[in-house]
Amino acid sequence: MKKTVKFLILTLILGLCCFTGKFSFYANAETATKIYLGGFPAGFNIYTKGAFVAGLSDVITENGIESPAKDAGIHVGDVILYLNGAEINNAKDIENTLKTAKSGKITVIYVRNGDENSTEILPVKDLSGIKRLGIFVRDNFNGIGTVTFINGERIATLGHPILGEYGEIMQITGGEIYKSDITGYVKGERGTAGELRGIFLKNQSIAKIDKNCLYGVFGNIAENFDKSTLTEIEIGDAQIGCASIFTTIDGTEPKMYDISIVKTDTLFSDTKNYVIKVSDKGLLETTGGIVQGMSGSPIIQNGKLVGAITHVFINDPTRGFGISVKNMINQ
């Protein structure tokens, strides 16, 4: 979760510690009166559609140094979808396509800032005789976040999407959610966001990811996932006043921390429905307030789940935004 956005003041998306379109959806509270409360940390491994260009490189050839991708106008953050009509999802796909491609330029279909584009690249051979484009790609993203709730067989997390280099919602092909152990944190300070640090428990997959949208990252829980240790809770509407967040800053077990909801807006905002302020002395002394990795942490008021944390204010880590649970409930 590395993106910053402007909304009167600077805020930071809290999603994966490492990581616009508009959906016209409003959930009906009657569709699920009780769900299972999250608050526990999770490790995310998300696979993207296409190969994400993580870097550009020079290629040393017999004729000197060349930069085919850069010369063709490819940028870091672009997502390559096709080479000469062949679908690309990872570095191996690129390698195989280049091996079978005829001499000359190849056609590249890629996405930048949500728009599909086309260009031509002339591959070059390195000193080993291997065709290169001069790019580094990755096909997955991973990091730490927080589970908001489980509704039937569906798991809801983060409360915001995983974004690409240009702020667009990343298209995904799937992924895994694992249990996670929080091993430490970096305290947030004015002007600098803090973060949770943790490890994936790789042998403990809890869900398969199938959706990355405006309202968060969603999937289906594993068949062997035990919900008996979780707390059932009703969903409700928030109002200005005292509330709590249920989050984990050490180990695997979440705890309640005091906050105040200081502003609500569920009519005109899809995701920034609440402004919250941390008042819990213990949380302020440890993390400094809201930090990256808390994204998805449940907001509870009057014994009901009303939303999840999504952003921290860069200039004030005690404050942040939250999303209404009703925007997440049926995803």
Language-model-detected regions and their locations in the chain:
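PDZ/PDZ-like groove recognition
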Residues: 40-75
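Short, small/polar residue-rich loop motifs at catalytic or cofactor-binding pockets
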Residues: 67, 291-294
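Conserved PDZ fold ligand-binding element
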Residues: 69-91, 299-302, 306-310
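PDZ-domain C-terminal substructure recognizer with occasional recognition of PDZ-binding tails
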Residues: 28-32, 40-42, 75, 95-135
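PDZ domains, with a preference for the canonical peptide-binding region formed by the helix
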Residues: 82-113, 316-318, 323-327
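Sec-dependent N-terminal signal peptides of Gram-positive bacterial secreted proteins and lipoproteins
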Residues: 2-26
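Serine endopeptidase catalytic core focused on the charge-relay Asp
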Residues: 124-288, 292, 301-302, 310, ...
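Short, flexible surface segments
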Residues: 49, 76-77, 239, 295, ...
